[in-house]
UniProtKB/Swiss-Prot annotation:
GO BP term, example: biosynthetic process
Listed name of the protein: Thioesterase frbD
Top enzyme category: hydrolase
Gene name of this polypeptide: frbD
EC identifiers of the protein: 3.1.-.-
Top-level taxon of the source organism: Eukaryota
UniProt cross-references to InterPro entries, sorted A to Z: AB_hydrolase_fold, Thioesterase
Length: 261
C-alpha cells in the first residue's frame, strides 16, 4: 500500500433535475457512491464524487483537507459557476463541510448549504480501524473490492480522528453556510444509547440531537430531520424512499435559507 500522487476525482452525474440548485454528494467512509444511485428523484440535478484512490487502496497523507481540495477542484471543472448544495453520508458530510470552506471566497461557485446525512462530529477513536464494525457487504462482492472497502474504512477512522472542522474555519476567518442534518433513528445492532465502545463510533453521539455538532463551536446546523433505520440501514431498500423524501425536503428548505451571499 503506497501513497498516490495527486489523484484526480471525477464528478459523476447521478440524477438530472430542474432549475433547483444542484446537489453534490461526497462518498461515505467506504469510498463509493453506489448508495446515492438508489435515491428516488430529488427534483434537482445530483452529482456524486467517489474516492479516486479506492481501487488501489492508497492513502490520503494530507487528510480530510487533501481530499476536500481534490474534490473542490473536480467540482470547479464540472460545474463552473452558480449556487450549489454539497453534502454526503457519514464521512462524506464532513468532507463536504471542508469543501464549502474552500469555496467561501470563490467568485464563480457559491455553496449555499450543506447536507449532513448521519454524519457525527469527528471524534478520536481509541482502537484501530480493524476493530471497528464494518457495514454489511453483498455476499458476492469480490475479494479485492472487500479489501478496498476495509482499507477505506480504516483510513476514514484515522482521518476523522485527526480533523478539526472548527480550526479549519477559524483559520479561514469564515463561517460555514447553513446546514441540514439528517440523522438515523436507530442504533446499530449490538449498540445502544449507553454504549461507548469504539466499534460503534457512528452511535457514540446519537443521544445528542446534533450528533455532537452542538459541541463544535460552529453553530451552522439550521434544521434536523430523522430517517428510519440505523446508520448502515438508512439506504436499504425498505428505508431509501423515506430517506429520499427527507433529503429532498432538506435541500428545498436549505435553498430558501440565507446562504451568505
Amino acid at each position: 500500500m503506497t501513497d498516490s500522487p495527486a489523484p484526480r476525482a471525477s464528478v459523476q452525474l447521478i440524477q438530472t433535475g430542474g432549475a433547483a440548485m444542484p446537489l453534490v454528494l461526497i462518498h461515505d467512509a467506504c469510498g463509493t457512491i453506489y448508495t446515492y444511485h438508489a435515491l428516488s428523484k430529488l427534483g434537482r440535478t445530483v452529482y456524486g464524487i467517489g474516492n479516486p484512490r479506492f481501487e488501489k487502496c492508497t492513502s490520503w497523507t494530507g487528510g480530510i483537507g487533501e481530499m476536500a481540495a481534490c474534490y473542490h477542484a473536480a467540482i470547479k471543472q464540472r460545474i463552473r459557476r452558480g449556487k450549489i448544495l454539497v453534502g454526503g453520508w457519514s464521512l462524506g458530510g464532513v468532507i463536504a463541510l471542508e469543501i464549502a470552506r474552500l469555496f467561501a471566497d470563490d467568485a464563480a461557485i457559491h455553496v449555499h448549504g450543506v447536507v449532513l446525512i448521519d454524519s457525527p462530529f469527528p471524534s478520536k477513536a481509541t482502537v484501530t480501524g480493524e476493530d471497528l464494525q464494518l457495514p454489511p457487504l453483498p455476499p458476492g462482492l469480490p475479494a479485492n473490492r472487500r479489501q478496498s472497502v476495509a482499507f477505506a474504512m480504516r483510513e476514514a477512522v484515522d482521518l476523522l480522528g485527526d480533523w478539526d472542522p472548527k480550526a479549519s474555519w477559524q483559520r479561514a476567518d469564515k463561517k460555514p453556510p447553513p446546514a441540514a442534518l439528517i440523522r438515523a433513528l436507530d442504533y446499530l445492532p449490538g449498540s445502544s444509547a449507553d454504549a461507548q465502545r469504539d466499534e460503534f463510533l457512528v452511535d457514540r453521539m446519537r443521544t445528542q440531537k446534533l450528533l455532537g455538532w452542538e459541541n463544535s463551536g460552529l453553530d451552522f446546523i439550521r434544521a434536523t430531520y430523522e430517517a428510519p433505520g440505523h446508520h448502515w440501514g438508512i439506504f436499504s431498500s425498505e428505508n431509501v424512499a423515506c430517506l429520499s423524501d427527507t433529503l429532498s425536503k432538506a435541500c428545498a428548505e436549505l435553498e430558501v435559507v440565507d446562504g451568505g451571499r
